[in-house]
Amino acid sequence: MGDWSFLGRLLENAQEHSTVIGKVWLTVLFIFRILVLGAAAEEVWGDEQSDFTCNTQQPGCENVCYDRAFPISHIRFWALQIIFVSTPTLIYLGHVLHIVRMEEKKKEREEELLRRDNPQHGRGREPMRTGSPRDPPLRDDRGKVRIAGALLRTYVFNIIFKTLFEVGFIAGQYFLYGFQLQPLYRCDRWPCPNTVDCFISRPTEKTIFVIFMLAVACASLVLNMLEIYHLGWKKLKQGVTNHFNPDASEVRHKPLDPLSEAANSGPPSVSIGLPPYYTHPACPTVQGKATGFPGAPLLPADFTVVTLNDAQGRGHPVKHCNGHHLTTEQNWASLGAEPQTPASKPSSAASSPHGRKGLTDSSGSSLEESALVVTPEGEQALATTVEMHSPPLVLLDPERSSKSSSGRARPGDLAI
């Protein structure tokens, strides 16, 4: 047999542009077919015709019997099988080299156009792009040719034809020789005078090689089927992804803007949801009446009027405003009727129709709290009037103040 090194180099170049399963298939082809065929099988079948003997002296009978027993030698049959199975891969390799060469020529033309341009017109000019902006790049991140588009179709046809050739050669080997060689072969072909017995050399060893090459062919067939399934499943997932997200491929192949990358590199903003805050509008009528009540005395700076809503009140906010308005009017009326003397405060607090209770703290300021007020709408409101006075003056002489505060007459007192 001839030298397989040239075919091996070509297939090695094709291995760089194949899938993982395709690389395994090429490894099986190299080791278990080409090497075994060149190293061992040729030695076994080297003496095939010379050792094929028949029990006849008729000239030409032995040759015609050998031709019927072996229409084609096993060695040549397997060599043809390797060549036919490798041909689709070589066609795919030619397509890859053609694409790479076209890409190189396109880059050379772009560089030549840039060199021909004048410096005024050529500065800052980008290389011309002849392809569509949506076309995927020729090479992937690792610098290998991307299997996509027309190249992917060529690769699929490559696998399909390899599978068909494998099936055809397995079937041909079965119909030509079977899977086992018998040591005795009977031949009755002309010009043999009668049925003659012919004997095959090394039948057992040849049978082992036949079974081995058949097993390798079946393994290659299984690898082809797995590769078709792998590519089909990958293409199906890609189609489903593009169907549900048609802009994914555009975003994947679209170059990113450096400014957008810098803007997006910061920490993501986090929005915290807060519970809704409801505010009840202030009643304008109450505020106006409180400040401009007719006949109301001027309030000191330390006087504060606070109106509290009852937590159990229900109804429309307008009703609350009406209740607050009536309560404020009653407070101002009672405040105007009371004399502005400290002595009358306890009596006025005790005789208040609303049951006010006077509270005095340690600092001397008085606190007055009113009871619940029932509005005409049947609602309850709590009005609290707070009077805050400045603390009493501190006496400079405690003894003098105690003497003057005593009510009994002393001998040293002057009579006026």
Curated annotation (Swiss-Prot):
Keywords: Cell junction, Cell membrane, Disulfide bond, Gap junction, Membrane, Transmembrane, Transmembrane helix. Residues 16-19, 93-158, 229-416 are cytoplasmic. The chain crosses the membrane at residues 20-40, 72-92, 159-179, 208-228. It is found in: Cell membrane; Cell junction, Gap junction. GO terms for molecular function: gap junction channel activity; gap junction hemi-channel activity; identical protein binding. Disulfide bonds join 54-198, 61-192, 65-187. It is a multi-pass membrane protein. Residues 2-15 dip into the membrane without crossing it. InterPro entries: Connexin (IPR000500), Connexin46 (IPR002262), Connexin_C (IPR034634), Connexin_CCC (IPR019570), Connexin_CS (IPR017990), Connexin_N (IPR013092), Connexin_N_sf (IPR038359). Detected in eye lens (at protein level). Most abundant in lens, but also present in heart and kidney. SMART domains: CNX, Connexin_CCC. The keyword Transmembrane helix applies. GO terms for biological process: cell-cell signaling; gap junction-mediated intercellular transport; response to hydrogen peroxide; response to pH; visual perception. Residues 41-71, 180-207 are extracellular. It comes from the Eukaryota. GO terms for cellular component: connexin complex; gap junction; plasma membrane. Structural component of lens fiber gap junctions. Gap junctions are dodecameric channels that connect the cytoplasm of adjoining cells. They are formed by the docking of two hexameric hemichannels, one from each cell membrane. Small molecules and ions diffuse from one cell to a neighboring cell via the central pore. Belongs to the connexin family. Alpha-type (group II) subfamily. PANTHER family: CONNEXIN (PTHR11984), GAP JUNCTION ALPHA-3 PROTEIN (PTHR11984:SF12). This is Gap junction alpha-3 protein. It comes from Rattus norvegicus. The gene is Gja3.
